[in-house]
Structure formats: structure tokens, C-alpha cells
Amino acid sequence: MAKKSPENASPVAQFEQSLESLEQLVEQMETGELSLEASLSAYERGVGLYRQCQQALEQAELRVRLLSDPAQPEAAEPFDPPSHDG
């Protein structure tokens, strides 16, 4: 079975995949064996992964807030995350 592409994966799967990639990138950078150019490229990729993780966490937090508002339990509804092109 083919692996889902990141664009088609669920937000949770995207978060987990981005976090795993970020952790691997940090490990590579911490070895000190990368050239300056490779380190800069890795850092740039890491910043992008970090932003993806932050965005996924913000969406999850919003979803939890929408679902757990005790003042308006009838207002709980499925969360459709905003689409981000980029």
C-alpha cells in the first residue's frame, strides 16, 4: 500500500511526520559533521518543519476549544481547518 503524501495525510499524521523529520534533522546537525552549506540548508528545512508543527498544534488547540466550550455544548461542531496555500 502506498504511503500517503504529506498533503493528503491527516493533520495529526502531518504533525507526527514533521516532528519526526525535525528530530532527525536536529540529530544530524548536532553531530557537527555537516558542512556550513549543509548546516544552513538543514536549518532552513528545520524552520519550515517547526512552523508546520506549530500550525498543527494551533489547529488542534482551536479544535479542542470548539469542542469543549462548557458554556455552549450545543455549539460543538466538526472542525474544518482553514486551508493554507504555500
Curated annotation (Swiss-Prot):
It catalyses: Exonucleolytic cleavage in either 5'- to 3'- or 3'- to 5'-direction to yield nucleoside 5'-phosphates. GO terms for biological process: DNA catabolic process. The keyword Heme does not apply. One of its GO terms (cellular component) is cytosol. Gene3D superfamilies: Exonuclease VII, small subunit. PANTHER family: EXODEOXYRIBONUCLEASE 7 SMALL SUBUNIT (PTHR34137:SF1). Heterooligomer composed of large and small subunits. Bidirectionally degrades single-stranded DNA into large acid-insoluble oligonucleotides, which are then degraded further into small acid-soluble oligonucleotides. This is Exodeoxyribonuclease 7 small subunit.
